[in-house]
């Protein structure tokens, strides 16, 4: 049996500090303590003694335990004794009573295999079967036969017992059997610890790394323990070391020595919102091969000049295939989707060149874009006065030409981005659409509505003159009165007008009189059917009334 080592925490049946307790689990009791006892192997701590628990009363057993910690549970190794020589039943009788098995035996498993059996015993004082039950309980741990066969040359068979006393009758689940803490037992702890070994904490030496060549072990630095004398020598030798030569760093003029890659890099005041004068502006990104300088013209915030928005058209076949691109992609990203939809509509229609008689001069349009809104109105008024009376009357009767001339003025009046392609507006005009689509001016439905409106007003000439006059007044550029009159809303109106043209164009080639006649016939037929249905209902009501009255007369007779 192994004894406790001198430096162990368990000495003389006690632990060297409070809180340490012997509280093993069922698996630990069977697989370590009981198995090692049967196989005669060494135990690290001698805490369980060999005692025959059936030869003593329960009150005498705590004094026989090797644990003197004050805990209220004790452990013992007991050789298995037989009640009868050729029987497997143990003799559990004592001098003043007996231990009786109670409850159900529990199997102890380890690694999914059965390694032992746990049995609960209760002590009865007196002779069976009229003994008096006490609060002394004992757990018996035995090893399984298969697990016992794993031991080599077992000499003697033991059973392990755990003894404790309950606080009263009935089950006491969760009851603690540890020793209560007594402060008086640990007051003279320092005086009693005479054999304590003083543990000297070693000082951490200062390690110095010296440069060394590579050796076979492939270590580049060799650690060398540095003593205090060496440190003093090093500190004393520092003032004698040659000093570092003081070198004056020459002063350098950054303007002369440093070269800058920036153009026109000179000290000046930062002025925001600057634009070079007489510089051609375009939405297309430009790649300049040489650097030019020009005076700066400063503008007010949130103001865009007409020159910044105007594009000089380039005639070619590509004008109908790609839309205008902006140089600053982050400035007009919100209008790219609508602009693409507008170009898709223009791509679906055929383009044809504009006649010289009906088209405006391109040079005059580009020059007029440089004028202000007041100058443009004055120019239009002069052009209107210079015309002959016949041309003035034609322009009033057909305001489409006047509207075409001032469309660009309305579109560019607001300080927003251009939402349509100027190349398409200058290079060609919309031709007559294919079958199924007709222009808005040739729509028969619109002509019929216009005729009906003229009849209601009492005269076609006066109504047409007033409508043309109102169209001319509406075309005069002015500040929008509400958000719905902005350029973005007009863009949606123009885009939606194409869908209206296609919808109204489905009635191409169909006379309006035929449609009106069909509607009148349908209305008359519906009215006739309603009258016939009402007459039939009245007839059936009369017939039913006559039948009922006839039956009542027959019953009276």
UniProtKB/Swiss-Prot annotation:
Major place of residence: endoplasmic reticulum
Record-annotated DNA-binding residue ranges: 115-172
Keywords in alphabetical order: Activator, DNA-binding, Endoplasmic reticulum, Membrane, Nucleus, Stress response, Transcription, Transcription regulation, Transmembrane, Transmembrane helix
Cellular component, GO, one term: endoplasmic reticulum membrane
Transmembrane spans: 526-546
PROSITE patterns linked: NAC (PS51005)
Induction notes from the record: By cold and drought stresses.
Bilayer topology annotation: Single-pass membrane protein
Domain NAC: 16-166
Domain note: The NAC domain includes a DNA binding domain and a dimerization domain.
Protein name, per record: NAC domain-containing protein 17
């Amino acid at each position: 049996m192994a004894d406790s080592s001198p430096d162990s925490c368990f000495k003389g049946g006690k632990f060297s500090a409070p809180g340490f307790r012997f509280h093993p689990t069922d698996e630990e009791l069977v697989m370590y303590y009981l198995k090692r006892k049967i196989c005669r192997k060494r135990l690290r701590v001698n805490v369980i003694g060999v005692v025959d628990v059936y030869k003593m009363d329960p009150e005498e057993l705590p004094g026989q335990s090797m644990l003197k910690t004050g805990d209220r549970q004790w452990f013992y190794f007991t050789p298995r004794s037989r009640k009868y020589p050729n029987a497997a039943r143990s003799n559990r009788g004592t001098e003043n009573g007996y231990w009786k098995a109670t409850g159900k035996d529990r199997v102890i498993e380890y690694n999914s295999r059965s390694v032992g059996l746990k049995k609960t015993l209760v002590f009865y004082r007196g002779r069976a079967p009229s003994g008096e039950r006490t609060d002394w309980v004992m757990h018996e741990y035995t090893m399984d036969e298969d697990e016992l066969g794993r031991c080599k040359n077992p000499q003697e068979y033991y059973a392990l017992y755990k003894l404790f006393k309950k606080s009263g009758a009935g089950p006491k689940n969760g009851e603690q059997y540890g020793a209560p803490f007594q402060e008086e037992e640990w007051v003279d702890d320092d005086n009693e610890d005479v054999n304590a070994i003083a543990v000297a904490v070693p000082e951490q030496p200062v390690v110095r790394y010296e440069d060394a060549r590579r050796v076979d072990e492939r270590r580049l630095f060799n650690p060398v323990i540095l003593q205090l004398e060496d440190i003093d020598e090093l500190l004393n030798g520092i003032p004698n070391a040659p000093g570092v030569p003081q070198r004056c760093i020459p002063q350098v003029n950054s303007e002369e020595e440093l070269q800058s890659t920036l153009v026109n890099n000179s000290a000046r005041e930062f002025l925001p919102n600057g634009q070079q004068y007489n510089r051609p502006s375009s939405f297309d990104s430009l790649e300049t091969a040489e650097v030019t300088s020009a005076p700066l013209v400063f503008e007010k915030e949130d103001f865009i000049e007409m020159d910044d928005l105007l594009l000089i058209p380039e005639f070619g076949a590509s004008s109908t295939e790609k839309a205008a691109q902006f140089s600053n992609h982050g400035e007009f990203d919100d209008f790219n989707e609508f602009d693409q939809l507008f170009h898709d509509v223009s791509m679906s229609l055929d383009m044809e060149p504009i006649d010289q008689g009906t088209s405006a001069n391109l040079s005059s349009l580009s020059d007029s874009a440089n004028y202000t809104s007041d100058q443009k109105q004055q120019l239009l008024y002069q052009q209107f006065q210079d015309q002959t009376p016949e041309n003035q009357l034609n322009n009033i009767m057909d305001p489409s030409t006047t509207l075409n001339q001032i469309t660009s003025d309305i579109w560019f009046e607001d300080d927003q981005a251009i939402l349509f392609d100027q190349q398409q507006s200058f290079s060609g005009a919309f031709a007559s659409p294919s079958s199924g689509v007709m222009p808005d001016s040739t729509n028969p439905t619109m002509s019929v509505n216009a005729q009906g409106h003229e009849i209601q007003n009492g005269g076609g000439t006066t109504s047409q003159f007033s409508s043309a006059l109102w169209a001319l007044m509406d075309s005069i550029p002015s500040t929008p009165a509400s958000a719905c009159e902005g350029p973005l809303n007009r863009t949606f109106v123009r885009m939606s007008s194409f869908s209206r043209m296609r919808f109204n164009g489905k009635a191409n080639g169909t006379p309006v009189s035929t449609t009106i006649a069909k509607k009148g016939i349908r209305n008359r037929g519906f009215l006739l059917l309603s009258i016939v249905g009402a007459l039939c209902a009245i007839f059936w009501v009369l017939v039913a009334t006559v039948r009922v009255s006839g039956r009542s007369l027959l019953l009276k007779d």
